[in-house]
Amino acid sequence: MLLHTFEAEGKSVCLFPGRQPDAPVLYLNTFPGEGERVLRALRETGCADFSLVAVSNLDWNCDMAPWDAPPAFARSGPFTGGAQEYLGLLTQKIIPLAEGQLASAPRWRGIAGYS
């Protein structure tokens, strides 16, 4: 499995190119090391070809929260509303860097990895 890795503002990014040059690309917000396991599991099901970009080293309570909010659980931290900044990082840096390493532009993009 061909793999390209890079960092963008502290986020770790792993790119697993699809077999077809214009395969769709899926951006997965995940934990370190999970991208390859997810890709392998999906390929075992016989799903259509796609490229996977696994983004990790996330601050879940900041990067995935659109606004400040109190902790959801007694022993967890508050949500700090950094989703807009993360979305900017994703669209302005991660996507261009990742797709610049692909053979051609993807047919479409998707995003996954958070409830």
Where would I find each of the regions flagged by the language model?
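Non-catalytic cap/lid and distal C-terminal segments of serine-dependent acyl enzymes
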Residues: M1-S115
